[in-house]
Amino acid sequence: MELTLHEARVIGCLLEKEITTPEQYPLSLNALTLACNQKTSREPVLDLSEAQVQDALDSLTKKRLISEQSGFGSRVVKYKHRFCNTEFSELQLSPAAVAIVCLLLLRGPQTPGELRTRSNRLHEFKDVIEVEDCIKQLISRTKPILKQLPREPGRRESRYVELFSETSANVVTTSDHTDKPHIPPVAALVEHGALVARVTELEQHVATLTQKFDELIASLT
C-alpha cells in the first residue's frame, strides 16, 4: 500500500487513539481532525480542514483501510481503521510492532532510542534492545515494512522509516543519494545528545497535557 501524507496521518491517529483513549474510539470527523492537527507528537505539524480529512477518509475507504460506524443512538458517523489486526486486515502485528509503526507514521523517521522514549503510552518497552529486536523482525518480513536509513551526523543511532507512505519513500530515496556526512567533534555529539534528550522529555510533558485537553474537549462535545 502507498499512503499520502494525509492518509498516513489519519491511519496513525486512529492507531494511536485506539490504544491511548479506547473509550473514545472510533473517532468522529471532528475528533480525528483534532488528532491530525495536534501540535505535539506530530512531525510535520499539519493544519488540515475537516474537508481534507474527509477526503483522506474517502480515499482510505476505497483502499479498504477504513470503515464507518454509526447508530447506537448517535447520528455522528465515526471511523475506525482496518489497517492491521482486524478480521479484514492482511497485516497482523504484535502490540510492540503497532506502537513502532504508529510512531513512524505520526512522526517520520526515528532512532530506536527515540521510539522507546516516545512509545510509553502505546507500549512499554523494557529497553532499547527490545525495540531493536522488534525493528529487525519488521525488516526481515517477507515484505519488509521498515527500512534503516544511513546514520546522520551527530547521531549514535541510525533512524528507521516505515514503508507505507509516499513521504517515507521520498526520505528513503533522498537518503540513498546523500553523500557521506562529515562527522562532528565528540563534544558536539555529546551536546547534541543532551539537547535531544531534553527536547524529548519536554515533548512528553506537552503530549500528556495535550491528551488531557483533548479528553476534556471530547467530553464536552
Curated annotation (Swiss-Prot):
Enumerate the Pfam families for this protein: DUF480
> Where does the source fall among the domains of life?
Bacteria
HAMAP family recorded = UPF0502 (MF_01584)
The record's comment on protein family reads:
Belongs to the UPF0502 family.
Stated name of the protein: UPF0502 protein Sputcn32_1644
| Organism in which the protein naturally occurs | Shewanella putrefaciens (strain CN-32 / ATCC BAA-453)
